[in-house]
């Protein structure tokens, strides 16, 4: 493997990068699916965190904390409730991972041709990460919306299957229904992925030489730190995205039945701050960070190992 921060930029063929990215997304998603469902349930709660009296207006369960939410879901919906939305999520993560790493590799190779006016390494990684994240997010967004809607279903099923959900949304909401909240998603993911890859590329050379690191390498540790830092900065947009994704004719049918009607990113932020306080923008942040650490570590570790395996297999042929 090449040294330093260039390893993600110039190693492997396009096919190897696509396959490795897809495998990384698939493995990571399955491992953290329960935490993702918990996060979505917490993000969709609308009662005030500072006013206990507001709990009386809640229609649906009240979730408090990661473990408590898991127990409630298992008790009311069974263990499979923790994997609701996993099919569209797996499809999304496989496609997202493949597109993300391919776009990142392609963008960095294009930027490398700008000599003698090449960007500084950190800025180059930021731009490449932002482009990769934006393209992958927009391309896979309908699957992200389906994942959220399935995860938000309680004991009463709104959508009976993946195909049925596609037909229902297309019929009742039109093509635009699949892209509710997309602007918040791109607005979130571009700085997130830019910061993630810039931090990852900066930390990996430093951590790669250290022993006894998680998962046996500096790749995973660098992925954890980069993800936690980037995730915290853009979390309010992630929450807004989830609130917008469940808008439409089925808004009052999810496990939280009194989700308000939101229109647009900025008006949603303003309404949440007005009714739930600034803390309302950070519902689910704890579980999101808990999820981000293993998810990013597993993703980067699996990607690196898959790519190495594919490269070694090609050499052995």
Curated annotation (Swiss-Prot):
This is Mitochondrial thiamine pyrophosphate carrier 1. Solcar repeats lie at residues 12-110, 120-206, 214-309. Mitochondrial transporter that mediates uptake of thiamine pyrophosphate (ThPP) into mitochondria. The chain crosses the membrane at residues 17-35, 91-107, 126-146, 184-200, 221-237, 284-301. InterPro entries: Mit_carrier, Mitochondrial_Carrier, Mitochondrial_sb/sol_carrier, Mt_carrier_dom_sf. Its main location: mitochondrion. One of its GO terms (cellular component) is mitochondrial inner membrane. GO terms for biological process: thiamine pyrophosphate transmembrane transport. Keywords: Membrane, Mitochondrion, Mitochondrion inner membrane, Repeat, Transmembrane, Transmembrane helix, Transport. PROSITE patterns: SOLCAR. It comes from the Eukaryota. It holds the Pfam family Mito_carr. It is a multi-pass membrane protein. Belongs to the mitochondrial carrier (TC 2.A.29) family. It is found in: Mitochondrion inner membrane. GO terms for molecular function: thiamine transmembrane transporter activity.
